[in-house]
C-alpha cells in the first residue's frame, strides 16, 4: 500500500508541475517570426529515432510563440512514441494554413474518445497499454497551444493503424 501511495503522490506532483510550467509559459512568451520547419526538424533530431519518418517542406515561417509550439509538437510526438513504434511526421504549407500531421502505428483512440483526450488530466486506459507515466495533460496542452495560435487540432485513424493528429495553423 505504501508503494502505491508513493507512486500516486509522484504522479500528482508530475501533473501539477507540468500544468504550472505550461501556465507560466503561456503568459510570458511573446510572438516571434521563426522557421517552424527548421525548428521541428531540430526537435525531431533530438529524439534520435530511426522509426520517425519525416516529410518536411522547408522554409515555412510562422509568427507565434516558438517555445510553446515546440512543447505542443513534443507532446504529440511523445504520445505517438509512447503508444506506437513507427511515427510519420509531415509539415506543409497550403494557401492560408500550415498543416502538421503526426501519425503512429499504435492501438489508436476510439472515435468516441476523440473529444475527451483534449480534457486536462483525462487518460484512456483501455487498449492503450500501461499509462503509468501519463498524467493526461499532453494532448490537452497541445490543444490549448494550437487554439491560442488561432489554429485547430483534429484526430483521425492513421494510415499506419494508430492515431493521426492534424494541426492546422493560420499564417
Question: Where is each model-derived feature located?
Answer:
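A residue-level detector for a conserved hydrophobic packing site
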Residues: 69-73
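Conserved catalytic submotifs in the C-terminal HATPase_c
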Residues: 53-67, 92-95
Amino acid at each position: 500500500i505504501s508503494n502505491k501511495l508513493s507512486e500516486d503522490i509522484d504522479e500528482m506532483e508530475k501533473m501539477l508541475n507540468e500544468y504550472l510550467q505550461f501556465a507560466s509559459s503561456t503568459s510570458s512568451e511573446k510572438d516571434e517570426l521563426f522557421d517552424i520547419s527548421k525548428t521541428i526538424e531540430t526537435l525531431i533530431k533530438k529524439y534520435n529515432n530511426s522509426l520517425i519518418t519525416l516529410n518536411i517542406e522547408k522554409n515555412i515561417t510562422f509568427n507565434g510563440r516558438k517555445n510553446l509550439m515546440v512543447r505542443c509538437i513534443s507532446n504529440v510526438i511523445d504520445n505517438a512514441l509512447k503508444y506506437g513504434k513507427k511515427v510519420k511526421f509531415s509539415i506543409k504549407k497550403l494557401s492560408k494554413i500550415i498543416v502538421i500531421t503526426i501519425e503512429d502505428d499504435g492501438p489508436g483512440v476510439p472515435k468516441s474518445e476523440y473529444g475527451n483526450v483534449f480534457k486536462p488530466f483525462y487518460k484512456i486506459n483501455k487498449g492503450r497499454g500501461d499509462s503509468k507515466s501519463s498524467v493526461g495533460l499532453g494532448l490537452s496542452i497541445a490543444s490549448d497551444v494550437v487554439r491560442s495560435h488561432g489554429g485547430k487540432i483534429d484526430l483521425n485513424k492513421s494510415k499506419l493503424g494508430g492515431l493521426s493528429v492534424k494541426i492546422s495553423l493560420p499564417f
